[in-house]
UniProtKB/Swiss-Prot annotation:
Originating organism: Idiomarina loihiensis (strain ATCC BAA-735 / DSM 15497 / L2-TR)
Keyword Transmembrane helix listed: no
Listed GO CC annotations: cytosol
Subcellular location: Cytoplasm
Stated name of the protein: Probable transcriptional regulatory protein IL1088
Keyword entries, A-Z: Cytoplasm, DNA-binding, Transcription, Transcription regulation
Any coiled-coil regions, as ranges: none
GO MF annotation list: DNA binding
């Protein structure tokens, strides 16, 4: 299909910035702990935990660290009392923004989030104001070197919902959250190494941003992702690879 993977360019930028800030392990451990607390400590019966562990392993987290986080979540070890919160809002040019947070202090978190929105041209919305624009999906991405033919049969047989192939050579395999682990296992078994694999919030529609709007929006995105309590930031902005490259220079 025409264009490029709609979440690849900003995802790669975000991953690099998370690593630079040294925050990626903190967020991964928090997600593993809460996933185990909510759905149990067995990744075979807890798809969310399975996805969190896979992501941690892909970021070279040690298995001992993962096991400790699972035990804290499942109650085998003492852990922090962390709440999950979702906030919704709009960025510049009407971009919808959905935040997943984990916090031990709700008042601090909402104050920090509201400040970031108001400072950088956005506004914090009410519950339900943008969540309906997103659907939770598993996304397994492949870059150059993996063909649509290679992923088609094993992905669909394992329960994938869709396969999107883009002009520049990348491929996204779309799954339900429940089938994410099974589909990834099937593709891994074929020796197909994903460039990125996660359960995420996929927007129904996108808002195209020009360079100036993108510059403003990315400042807001950086500010939100830099907040300690913010776990994930989802949005429906579409920014071209060329604009991303110019703004990163």
């Amino acid at each position: 299909m025409a264009g490029h993977s709609k979440w690849s360019n900003i995802k790669h930028r975000k991953a690099a910035q998370d690593a630079k800030r040294g925050k990626i392990f903190t967020k991964l451990i928090r997600e593993i702990t809460v996933s185990a607390r909510e759905g149990g400590g067995d990744p075979e019966t807890n798809p969310r935990l399975r996805a969190a562990i896979d992501k941690a392993l892909s970021n070279n987290m040690k298995r001992d660290t993962i096991d400790t986080a699972v035990k804290r979540g499942s109650g085998d070890l003492e852990g922090d009392n962390v709440d999950e919160l979702t906030y919704e809002g709009y960025g510049p040019s009407g971009v919808a923004v959905l935040l997943e947070c984990m916090t031990d202090n709700r008042n601090r978190t909402v104050s920090d989030v509201r400040h970031a929105f108001s400072k950088l041209g956005g506004n914090l919305g009410t519950d339900g104001s943008v969540a309906y624009l997103f659907n939770k999906k598993g996304v397994i991405s492949y870059s150059d070197g993996v063909t649509e033919e290679q992923v088609m049969e094993p992905a669909l047989e394992a329960g994938a919902e869709d396969i999107l192939a883009y002009d520049e050579g990348s491929i996204d395999v779309i799954t339900s959250p429940e089938n994410f682990g099974a589909v990834k296992d099937a593709l891994d078994a074929k020796g197909l190494e994903a460039s990125n694999a996660e359960v995420t919030q996929v927007p129904d529609t996108r808002v195209d941003l020009d360079e100036e709007s993108a510059r403003t929006f990315l400042k807001l995105l950086d500010a939100l992702e830099d907040l300690d309590d913010v776990q994930n930031v989802y949005h429906n902005a579409d920014i071209s690879d060329e604009i991303i490259a110019r703004l990163d220079d």
